[in-house]
Amino acid sequence: MNIDIVISADHIDEKRLINKTVIIIDILRATSVITTAINNGCKKVIPVLTVEEAKDIAKNSKEDIILGGERNALKIDGFNFSNSPLEYTKKYVEGKTVVLSTTNGTRAINNSFNAKTILISALINSKATAKAIDKLNEDLIIINSGTNGQFSIDDFICSGYLIDCLYNIRKDLELSDIAKTAHYIYTNNKDIESFVKKATHYSRLKSLNLEKDLEYCFQKDIIDVVPQYKDGYIIKLNI
């Protein structure tokens, strides 16, 4: 199995994704939100690029819609929820459709439509994702959503942890240089939050008093669900 990493949504080459399994990572916080919502019984998540598109879906849909997302880490005016996974509890999302628009994560998803399979991962479900990847048994591209088009330490080390989870299942992994680097960084910094504390995105969220979000997102493997993007929306993967 060949594994490569793309360092941000702006670095996605759509032609490279053809016939590949793609993993989208945005641990702070879009993929943590999506994974949490699906785990809590959300019917589906619709990732969109713009606020206007999200509001149009909510206006025209007959489904029970929750609008969620952020711009520059802040809740979007008129939306039900921000980009905090702690808001997407079973009480609020079970049986409902979440329309989500974020600065980085939903852009990475929408830039990956050429892939054969698109899975959603974060620290909170990395082992479950690794098991799914093993069953799919296809070459893999891990896409880091990044921060405003730039490299993001938090997504990168999460990629390294995901690779480590895969190594615990199978040894026939062929890593690109960047994938080797991510794995090396994780194996030498297994206390991920301590390593990430100086990162730009981490500092931004902490400055907004979002410590509880950070604490939640840096937990490993508390969820055994893998979301999959397919045909315009995200649902629970069944393989």
Curated annotation (Swiss-Prot):
GO terms for molecular function: 2-phosphosulfolactate phosphatase activity; magnesium ion binding; sulfopyruvate decarboxylase activity. Belongs to the ComB family. Its EC number is 3.1.3.71. Pfam families: 2-ph_phosp. This is Probable 2-phosphosulfolactate phosphatase. The keyword Heme does not apply. SUPFAM superfamilies: ComB-like. InterPro entries: ComB-like, ComB-like_sf. It catalyses: (2R)-O-phospho-3-sulfolactate + H2O = (2R)-3-sulfolactate + phosphate. It comes from the Bacteria. Its cofactor is Mg(2+). The keyword Magnesium applies. It is an enzyme of class 3 (hydrolase). Keywords: Hydrolase, Magnesium.
